[in-house]
Amino acid sequence: MPSSPSRSILRGLTVSEICKFIPQSWKQLPRPISETSKTHDDESVPQVLFNSFRHCISHGQLYEAFRTFSLLRYQSGSHEFVLYSSASLLSTCVGFNEFVPGQQLHAHCISSGLEFDSVLVPKLVTFYSAFNLLDEAQTITENSEILHPLPWNVLIGSYIRNKRFQESVSVYKRMMSKGIRADEFTYPSVIKACAALLDFAYGRVVHGSIEVSSHRCNLYVCNALISMYKRFGKVDVARRLFDRMSERDAVSWNAIINCYTSEEKLGEAFKLLDRMYLSGVEASIVTWNTIAGGCLEAGNYIGALNCVVGMRNCNVRIGSVAMINGLKACSHIGALKWGKVFHCLVIRSCSFSHDIDNVRNSLITMYSRCSDLRHAFIVFQQVEANSLSTWNSIISGFAYNERSEETSFLLKEMLLSGFHPNHITLASILPLFARVGNLQHGKEFHCYILRRQSYKDCLILWNSLVDMYAKSGEIIAAKRVFDSMRKRDKVTYTSLIDGYGRLGKGEVALAWFKDMDRSGIKPDHVTMVAVLSACSHSNLVREGHWLFTKMEHVFGIRLRLEHYSCMVDLYCRAGYLDKARDIFHTIPYEPSSAMCATLLKACLIHGNTNIGEWAADKLLLETKPEHLGHYMLLADMYAVTGSWSKLVTVKTLLSDLGVQKAHEFALMETDSELDGENNKPMNDDSVINQEQSSDEERLVEVG
């Protein structure tokens, strides 16, 4: 009798050998009543036993069902009773995760000659697939002479569930070679496998087969095709499929909306959402989460926030995924007010209990990114049993706000609580040492990482080390870490390129960018910001212009506001003020105040009052800056051009901001002020040790 699921299937054995696997209880039952002695009442015995068997199966009484089956197979002369009973028992064994009885039953089926019956084969394939014995399941499928696609569908689906996508495609090809026609259940599975493998060529082959079949307009097949072409980035093909569909469900709409959000075409995604409502299909929480997630991925944080707020206004239940999306959006744009609204929803609702840890961690991150460390720590304190991820969230929050003393204190507290830092903890701390200029501590953590074998291939950690050294100006150390890495990704290269760019070594940065391309690593929008910034700092106008113009067509990266800002800085540093102004005319976004201030300062340096006054008006009237340095630049430009009425307006605004005297409109010298960076005011007292007694400070206690 087999003892473990690892035993191979019973094949290639003699009947006598197979009988060894059949339980003795099945062999010791009395022989069936002879035909000559049967009465009219005796003829109903098999039916009574079969009904009893079905009762045991329906009530989950597996072993009682097996005992009844033993009686049934000896008392019944009907082949179908035994066949369908065996099929039911195999399904029940799967439901109860009982491998040994199921394998014993398979042995009985082999000895009875039922192994390749069309009813039993799909059940056997399902049984072995459920125990991850996929090779055995495939052997049964291929040895059967059944021309129905059902067992093949089960096998393909099992390979996909086990992430063995290549094998699932191979099974499909084998199925086709046997002349078995795929059905509406086969195609969605193999399409999913092609998408997972990014096998565009064979995906098109499967699509071609569908086009000449009767399943061309099947709802589930079309939905799978749309998702596949989304994976391939072929939004236009997906849209044509969607438009020709005579029937659409919520999955269809979600799939096509997801296509546009993944390509950062959010305007079209919102149009489709409106069409979805007009067509009578109600947008589910999946639809909203798809759009919000796409907005986050595209960097459209205001759009993501609007999605979550829209869910609330449309009375759509906000689940944990939507709440986390909303809190992430608030974190990125500093929307503390909305973050507190979401916090109140968390307090009042019980729908987040199953994922409360992730929601709380997102709350801590949101408050930290909005520089409200007091409330971040309140949320942290109210967690009854802190997990490692919760410790990581609060430590990362204080590190982000450059509170080195509190970060060190929290790290010690975490160690005292019995938690050891993992790669996420260390990756969140390392950037702090570059920002506060405490590279010695960073080197100590570098040694800590080197001493632990478990961090040897942790890419995120080594990327953080490269970034720490690069941002500290220690480019040789950054390069040394880079060279020691066995695996690199776009983050690794981006950190190194940014480091060389900061030091004014634009040619070297471009050389590493080319090396990245040769290595087959595709850059993203952050990489392009680093490269353009390197060109700007090294006055590489021609190279920067080429990269900017070819970004979408050559690298497949959509131009973002940051890229336009880099080009304005590049042209301004080189004195090409006309080209810098042209950027404002072509940009599809609302220009930032930092971009206007960059052009304004360049005009003051180069004495171009014409473009300077235009930039000043744009800065004052359209972008409405909140940074003091920008107002000082405005005042200087209006003083130079003699625009006294506008100068008075600026002085009034400065007065409203509480500035009494500002060096008589002196130019601001620091780059950080020109770039519009927010200097976060830090309280000298430790946030951790502050009293938290007021009602406002205890937001988490408010209903």
UniProtKB/Swiss-Prot annotation:
The text of the family note is: Belongs to the PPR family. PCMP-E subfamily.
Could you tell me the gene encoding this protein?
A: PCMP-E24
Q: What is the organism field in this record?
A: Arabidopsis thaliana
**Protein name per UniProt:** Pentatricopeptide repeat-containing protein At1g22830
- Locate the region Type E motif: 595-671
Keywords, A to Z?
A: Repeat
Q: Which GO terms describe its molecular function?
A: RNA binding
Spans of PPR repeats, please give.
82-116, 117-147, 148-182, 183-217, 218-248, 249-283, 284-318, 319-353, 356-386, 387-421, 422-452, 458-488, 489-523, 524-554, 560-594
Keyword Electron transport carried by entry: no
Asked whether the UniProt record includes Kinase among its keywords, one would answer: no
Q: InterPro entries under this entry?
A: Pentatricopeptide_rpt, PPR_At4g14850-like_plant, TPR-like_helical_dom_sf
Q: Which region ranges are annotated with the description Disordered?
A: 671-703
GO biological process terms, alphabetically, are: RNA modification
